[in-house]
Amino acid sequence: RYIEARPSKFALDVAFNPKTTEWQLSYDGRKNEPVTLPMKFPLLLAQGAEGIAVGLSTKILPHNFNELIDAAVKYLRGKRFELYPDFQTGGMLDSTDYEQGKRGGRVKVRAHIEELDKKTLVIRSVPYGVTTTQLMESIVKANDQGKIKIKKVTDNTAAAVEVQVDLATGVSSDITIDALYKFTDCEVSLSPNACVIVEQRPQFLSVQELLKQSVDHTKDLLDNELRIRQAELLEKWHYSSLEKIFFEEKIYKELEKKHEDWEKVIKAIDSAFDPFKKKLKRAITREDILKLTEKPVRRIYRLDIAELDAQIKQLEAELKQVKHDLDNLVDYTVAYYENLQKKYGKGRERKTELKQFEVIQAKQVAIVNAEPYVK
């Protein structure tokens, strides 16, 4: 399928730069499309990913936006960092056996369950990957199997998750909460498996290694952007300097002289620049001279030396800043991440609470009951 998309403001900041993007013709040959996007953010870790192929599978859990940026800055500063999953669905997470997302690791995720009163429980969040429908079905199933004892379960979810569980008479709410975690989808176990393609080969990495690769890639992309910017500024400085000399030294008058042919005019202009060539940052080309001669004479006479001087000074200041950024690329990359956090980090605080769960014994919480009513 062919998919077109409009990038968001965030995507324009982190995933799109026409000057550093490799392009190819679209399926019908009418437009260009990116081969890959120059991603300057650990999007794979932020959004998570899951997939399966022949003999391989991957499951990368999502992580918190701000924590990823904090970790990136720590890595750039040579400090230790740790990363733990964070889910938009909230809930609680036991990351004791996370193993930084590598094969063999495991995390437990729980819903938030509140005691509304002695006879009523309210589930305020669902574990990652579980819907309220699945959650309710698992509760009914546990009740049918005699593992919990409830009267009914009701889905009052609107903007926020709210699943109400009405308990049977004489049933302990504390024991029921433990039983819900033990026998229903109020608690699920997830097994991460960070398998990614690196240099055309599948590799099993930790989330720390993934972040390091992303940060190194981002730094390289920023370096490339700075060098492109530097080249553009140098070109502008070169032409502005040529314009100033062309006007200030009255080299344009060569256009008024009678020469045998156009080539002689170009050669005469080039020779007139000889005393000033050492001041320039690159050689004068034929294209430079042609560009100068294409300017209408009336515009040449209107050139303002003071304005050209101001342009050149501004370009020199920008070149100085770009050189400083290239010489201090780590600081520049840190500033890039901090700017992202300032622009987009608000409202992206951690939603999943990190906790260490107590082991629940099945025999201590199983209850024989009657059939519930589901609404």
What are these regions (language model features)?
Residues 2-5, 9-10, 14, 18-19, ...:
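C-terminal interaction appendages of subunits in large macromolecular complexes
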Residues 20-32:
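Helix-hairpin-helix/helix-loop-helix acidic hairpins
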